[in-house]
Amino acid sequence: MTVQRKKISLIGAGNIGGALAHMVTLRELGDVVLFDVNDGIPQGKALDIAESSPIGGFSVNIIGTNRYGDIKNSDAIIITAGIARKPGMSRDDLLQTNAKVMKEVGENIRKYSPNAFVIVVTNPLDAMVSVVHKFSNLPANMIVGMAGVLDSSRFRYFLARELNISVEDVSAFVLGGHGDTMVPLIRCASIAGIPLTQIIDMGLITQEKVDEIVKRTRNGGKEIIDLLKSGSAYYAPASSSIYMLESYLRDEKRILPCATYLNGEYGVKDLFIGVPVIIGKNGIEKVLEVKMDDSEQEMFNKSVNAVKELVKSLSL
């Protein structure tokens, strides 16, 4: 009996797209189609990855292409296409340029892969996932933005390093938009099951240091851009996308913070915003509504309003 492998299409063959292609093949999550509008780049990266298969120990197929038709009947699609942030540039500066790219991508998903589960990575994330949703006509449960998983990973890493403990013992997540107004929920963070607030009371870390970590988390992407001088983060964004993809393909039902479509949850309607969701074989299977205190609610509302303004300024 022949086992039909999943088909995973990656739209954009830049740094994140290339890293994603390598990770998908190494994990043998499915056959890969690496798409980019620039001739030669997806073909070259796909060939490079394919040539590593004898020593990498994977047997899935990977092709590079400039034809949208090759993404036909994909099981899952991850979108990283668009221009990347440069030093001094905010995610919002990317808005109009990348919105046009997302419109084209969305229209082709609608044409060739209307049943795929789609993960959007392109910035400014919360607005871009709205554009893809609009032009792809995908059901709201089958499209999601990758942001909260990455922001939460940064938050967890910074806490672990400061406490000098394993990152695996740190549980924390971030709500809201993927930008300066994101809301790392300190009250919900825990260390090996012990609330972070108690860890502060024990004197293992100060509130001031936690506040610094929150600020660093908000500026996590900018910090890497400033260090690289050219380009932006790609290993952590790619890893975060794979985490979400695996939960869908393997029906793991992981609870992950993602930019998802809200239709009344959290008092928000018709907007993609970062909240915890369950991802399984049916895509976004449930939105979890976390109760917030007054301060957290105020920050969340500010983040929601920032995303609303961003979406409103789209000229499509």
Curated annotation (Swiss-Prot):
GO terms for molecular function: L-lactate dehydrogenase activity; L-malate dehydrogenase (NAD+) activity. This is Malate dehydrogenase. Its EC number is 1.1.1.37. It catalyses: (S)-malate + NAD(+) = oxaloacetate + NADH + H(+). It comes from the Bacteria. NCBIfam families: MalateDH_bact (TIGR01763), PRK06223.1 (NF004863). It is an enzyme of class 1 (oxidoreductase). InterPro entries: L-lactate/malate_DH, Lactate/malate_DH_C, Lactate/malate_DH_N, Lactate_DH/Glyco_Ohase_4_C, Malate_DH_type3, NAD(P)-bd_dom_sf. The keyword NAD applies. Belongs to the LDH/MDH superfamily. MDH type 3 family. Catalyzes the reversible oxidation of malate to oxaloacetate.
